[in-house]
Amino acid sequence: MTTVSMRDMLQAGVHFGHQTRYWNPKMKPFIFGARNGVHIINLEHTVPMFNEALAFISNIASKKGKVLFVGTKRAAGEAIKASALSCDQYYVDHRWLGGMLTNWKTVRQSIKRLKELESQSVDGTFDKLTKKEALMRSRELDKLEKSLGGIKNMGGLPDVLFVIGADHEHIAIKEANNLGIPVVAVVDTNSAPDGVNYIVPGNDDAMRAIRLYTSSVAAAANAGRGQDLAVQAEQDGFVEAV
């Protein structure tokens, strides 16, 4: 089972919160104290809470569940995308479009258009168009890929959201809440943990911390999928033996 240690978190700077004047009182139970005007997060809480979240994600992946990685802050985008791809899951790394979950029917139409344009870009259709029309379609393709590329093969709503920065991604969290989709989120000292099912109190800005979260979630998802494949292989073997 994928777990993260206290040492891993200390080395990544997970314990460094925001300046004390920006704190959200709802995060008080998870704050150890302050140093040089900066809140220090109590990792005695974070370690077990994150490991519990990892076990939950692994369990969902073991049942062929879909994990949607969400992190549109500049510091998070790259790690979100790389980690989601490393475990064959899905991501939103650029901008959360309002209604991405709650208006899935419309989003599905946009994904269909994205796939049409992708086909046209490789089957020679673009070459048959005027320069202006080809450029317009190419720009449309780039725009759609940027916003929907990470979910184009999701094939339906996700089974869990993994979010970096609860404050920054509050719209995504609200949509998940409305649909009953569980949320795992990194919540810094300046944020409210409202609507988060699995709170991970921690720094949501430092790239080392973000990479620790995303790579651990990817490892947990891969471990879960490994369990699923092992069970499947066992069942296949059993069927063959009969």
Swiss-Prot record:
The keyword Nuclease does not apply. One of its GO terms (molecular function) is structural constituent of ribosome. GO terms for cellular component: cytosolic small ribosomal subunit. One of its GO terms (biological process) is translation. PROSITE patterns: RIBOSOMAL_S2_1, RIBOSOMAL_S2_2. Pfam families: Ribosomal_S2. Keywords: Ribonucleoprotein, Ribosomal protein. InterPro entries: Ribosomal_uS2, Ribosomal_uS2_bac/mit/plastid, Ribosomal_uS2_CS, Ribosomal_uS2_flav_dom_sf. NCBIfam families: rpsB_bact (TIGR01011). Belongs to the universal ribosomal protein uS2 family. PANTHER family: 30S RIBOSOMAL PROTEIN S2 PROKARYOTIC AND ORGANELLAR, SMALL RIBOSOMAL SUBUNIT PROTEIN US2M. This is Small ribosomal subunit protein uS2. The gene is rpsB.
